[in-house]
Amino acid sequence: MLLEFTKMHGLGNDFMVVDLISQRAYLDTATIQRLADRHFGVGFDQLLIVEPPDVPEADFKYRIFNADGSEVEQCGNGVRCFARFVHERHLTNKTNITVQTKAGIVKPELGQNGWVRVNMGYPKFLPNEIPFVAEEPEALYTLELANDQNISIDVVNMGNPHAVTIVPDVLTADVAGIGPQVESHKRFPERVNAGFMQVIDDKHVRLRVFERGVGETLACGTGACAAAVSGMRRGLLANSVEVELAGGKLQIEWQEGDVVWMTGPTTHVYDGRLDLRYFQG
């Protein structure tokens, strides 16, 4: 069968977006892995699925699958692209959209020239909300790594789990070495996204993220939210912060006790069709 799809990206964090309202398809783990292959498939960080909602207050259901085929709760760059996709495909004429995710409801607002502002919901910090194994809540935790190495982390759930550590320079940070250890650390029973943040000043940070089930990506929207919130909680950052990632910049806003707002661009790369039989087992 022919499957229609759209390739999009948010700051280089790239997606294959599939409308399963207007067409039907079964995409299992192995099929998703083959589609994600950058040499033999479409190639993407995440697969985004548009489905009818299960709850009356939502316009759409938004499902996210990593390149390894694992389903995750949230993707910030993805939800911006999702909002643009459903609007451009005329699945809705709304510019303020209510979207159901595994992590709850998010509310993207379409702006001009592909920019989207998203209400990302409330950040969570308690160990059982991450989830993270700890005897009691603390401002910072020490994580033991290989070769007697320790790092200090903050933990934040932005719909998916994040560990944030501050580094002197993101360019020299050992993301490739430390990232996989943090991602699969035994204290994170559902694994975690590992963020490495450099504070430039109180309104500007640089960030690299080693994403759960993907590896390092050019940008991570929920990672930017988690890093900014972590810095704000530590008293290092103002309530509105520019987060600079390899793929570009996001603006993150947060007040204690309120929801997190993320604003950033989206890019529609191309539309395509493929014969799904070639990617199924």
Curated annotation (Swiss-Prot):
Substrate binds at N13, Q46, N66, G76, N77, N160, N193, E211, R212, G221, T222. It is an enzyme of class 5 (isomerase). Keywords: Amino-acid biosynthesis, Cytoplasm, Isomerase, Lysine biosynthesis. Its EC number is 5.1.1.7. GO terms for biological process: lysine biosynthetic process via diaminopimelate. GO terms for cellular component: cytosol. InterPro entries: DAP_epimerase_AS, DAP_epimerase_DapF. Signal peptide: none annotated. Pfam families: DAP_epimerase (PF01678). It is found in: Cytoplasm. Its main location: cytoplasm. One of its GO terms (molecular function) is diaminopimelate epimerase activity. The record marks H162, E211 as: Could be important to modulate the pK values of the two catalytic cysteine residues. Belongs to the diaminopimelate epimerase family. PANTHER family: DIAMINOPIMELATE EPIMERASE, DIAMINOPIMELATE EPIMERASE, CHLOROPLASTIC. Homodimer. This is Diaminopimelate epimerase. It comes from Acinetobacter baumannii (strain AB307-0294).
